[in-house]
Amino acid sequence: MSGTEKKLGFLASGYGLSPKEKDYPVLGFAVDSRKVAKGFVFGAFPGAKVNGEDFIEKAIAAGAVAIVARPEVKIEGAVHLVAENPRLAFAEMAARFYAPFPPVMAAVTGTNGKTSVAELCRQLWTITGHKAASIGTLGVITAKNSYSLGMTTPDVVTFLSCCSDLARADISHVIFEASSHGLDQYRSDGAKVIAGAFTSFSRDHLDYHGTMERYLAAKLRLFDERIAPDGTAVIWADDPAATTVIAHVQKRGLKLIDIGEKAEAIRLVNREADSQGQMITLSIKGESYKIRLPLIGGYQLSNALVAAGLVLATGGDIKQTMAALTLLKPVRGRLERATQSQNGAEVYVDYAHTPDGLRAAIEALRPHTEGLLWVVFGAGGDRDKGKRPEMGKIAANLADHVIVTDDNPRGEDAATIRKEVLVGAPLAEEIGGRKEAIFSAIKRAEKGDIVLIAGKGHEQGQIIGRGETMRVLPFDDVTVAKEAVL
């Protein structure tokens, strides 16, 4: 873990500490009591599933020197750092401990597109000569290596420690995915963000947020609070929620780069798709740019342009950035071409796991489909049940042949999940085993057909059960697709 010893008085200035308390050495931070060691500061946060306040005694027994917690919490045996918002206070203290961070830090939020924007932005920075990294669903990626952090937005200690490590490795530019969960729980607070992007907004995570209004409010926190006052917001203007986001950006006084057919800063004038990518025409500051983008699909076009907007927002040169767009590589699990069947059908894998994401993936592949468009997908267990029939309806309306299968059933009955999806797609085929479903589609698809395997993308496992009974069975859609053509 990065970070060197610092005094509690330096990390927690303004908390009314005694001279003796100010001199306490701090050796680390933790939000998990099992990771606390002597000299650590422990963050005790009330949570949706687990209450960190229940683990204060365990943290003190493990050597915690201070506890960040709400005023009403009783603490004996350690310094009580009182905070009405303990998550934010903890993040600010941890940031002082783990600093310095890379000088250029950007973030991206949105229901869909975060991972693609983060990876494409990292690529653009790298192509234009910067040492860059991305943090998110695919893990931590640099030009030289990559490693997993376990979730889209890791806990704040892992995040800040990671940023500190990247700075020590001479990484100057970092982009991270700011998920609604992460923003709501202050998991990526502390480090200065000079640019932030918005991709899209549609139904997802209602099992956590409860309503679409609270879900959007979580995402808006990036623009209301996280981007530095002198920072820049990059907005995909063609999304229905863009008007709301832009209003928040303007109220805050941030600089704005809007992008899309409806935009002023970077306007998409024309787009012509072919089997290898798309030719696009952009209008920027009165200049016209014709660019050959080597990515397929309208949604990857929008993601690439948002990534380019972030590069410009962080000091990039327009002509260099436009030239770099022609050199982009596809993102793992995002409309990734997996294989070609023995009959000549093209097979793609995509992470689409929301109604809007599934629609975008199918619509992206339709112009390239000469024959039938097959879709193999399912819905995750222990997640928003309301989106299941919606996804079924979208697949049924937009694809030619739909196979409903399993996708991380977790603690729910897999057959029940499939049944709820089939409400929206009553004529769809049902094949429970994901491998069997993929094999069936690929074996039957003909030359000119396209098979889309949706839901998992880059994921390497099928999650069965919950809690102590949870198992992650090895499963990779791309690998299984390749096995189907052997």
From Swiss-Prot:
Catalyzes the addition of meso-diaminopimelic acid to the nucleotide precursor UDP-N-acetylmuramoyl-L-alanyl-D-glutamate (UMAG) in the biosynthesis of bacterial cell-wall peptidoglycan. Its cofactor is Mg(2+). The gene is murE. It is found in: Cytoplasm. The modification N6-carboxylysine is found at residue 219. Its EC number is 6.3.2.13. It catalyses: UDP-N-acetyl-alpha-D-muramoyl-L-alanyl-D-glutamate + meso-2,6-diaminopimelate + ATP = UDP-N-acetyl-alpha-D-muramoyl-L-alanyl-gamma-D-glutamyl-meso-2,6-diaminopimelate + ADP + phosphate + H(+). It comes from Zymomonas mobilis subsp. mobilis (strain ATCC 31821 / ZM4 / CP4). Carboxylation is probably crucial for Mg(2+) binding and, consequently, for the gamma-phosphate positioning of ATP. ATP binds at residues 110-116. InterPro entries: Mur-like_cat_sf, Mur_ligase_C, Mur_ligase_C_dom_sf, Mur_ligase_cen, Mur_ligase_N, MurE/MurF_N, UDP-N-AcMur-Glu-dNH2Pim_ligase. Belongs to the MurCDEF family. MurE subfamily. This is UDP-N-acetylmuramoyl-L-alanyl-D-glutamate--2,6-diaminopimelate ligase. Pfam families: Mur_ligase, Mur_ligase_C, Mur_ligase_M. Meso-2,6-diaminopimelate binds at residues 383, 407-410, 455, 459.
